[in-house]
Amino acid sequence: MSRVAKAPVVLLAGVEVKLNGQEITVKGPKGELALVAHNAVVLTQEENTITFGPREGFDKAWAQAGTVRALVNNMVVGVTEGFTKKLTLKGVGYRANVAGNTVNLTLGFSHPVAHELPTGVKAECPSQTEIVLTGTDKQVIGQVAADIRAYRSPEPYKGKGVRYADEVVRTKEAKKK
């Protein structure tokens, strides 16, 4: 039995939720997000809460209910506060800048890397070695951050590369002669 699914999602002021069968649409001050819930999950909406439960005849129904509850909670937080992911670049000559809907990266390759941002994701560069991604969809923000990090992930000897701001890179000792 899922402890996560037992807790209802409380809707804050200014958030509208529409349930249409298994489809959930959350609308708030920062935008609108939609999700199709798994068939094993029963969704019920009271005044300002949404509760989740299992449907009979499905294995792992409580697990699916917990997953859907977490996704809906992330949607509610996303349309009210939004999500932020911060990346830092470490290395000589590693730079980033934002031009419109593109993040331009200089990462030591023979060519600059241009990463197109999907809709709903905004990027800022407070400095040449920092990228701040913001948006309403937590999954999309995390995926964009992972894609940018994958261009040049931190190497284990000097730690050069693109890393998350809170990431700690374990460095190895160089080979001794």
From Swiss-Prot:
Keywords assigned: Ribonucleoprotein, Ribosomal protein, RNA-binding, rRNA-binding
Gene3D superfamilies: Ribosomal protein L6, alpha-beta domain (3.90.930.12)
One BP term from GO: cytoplasmic translation
Pfam families per UniProt: Ribosomal_L6 (PF00347)
GO MF: rRNA binding; structural constituent of ribosome
Listed PROSITE patterns: RIBOSOMAL_L6_1 (PS00525)
One of the record's GO cellular component terms: cytosolic large ribosomal subunit
Domain of life: Bacteria
NCBIfam families assigned: L6_bact
Function: This protein binds to the 23S rRNA, and is important in its secondary structure. It is located near the subunit interface in the base of the L7/L12 stalk, and near the tRNA binding site of the peptidyltransferase center.
Subunit structure comment from the entry: Part of the 50S ribosomal subunit.
Family: Belongs to the universal ribosomal protein uL6 family.
Annotated protein name in UniProt: Large ribosomal subunit protein uL6
Protein encoded by which gene: rplF
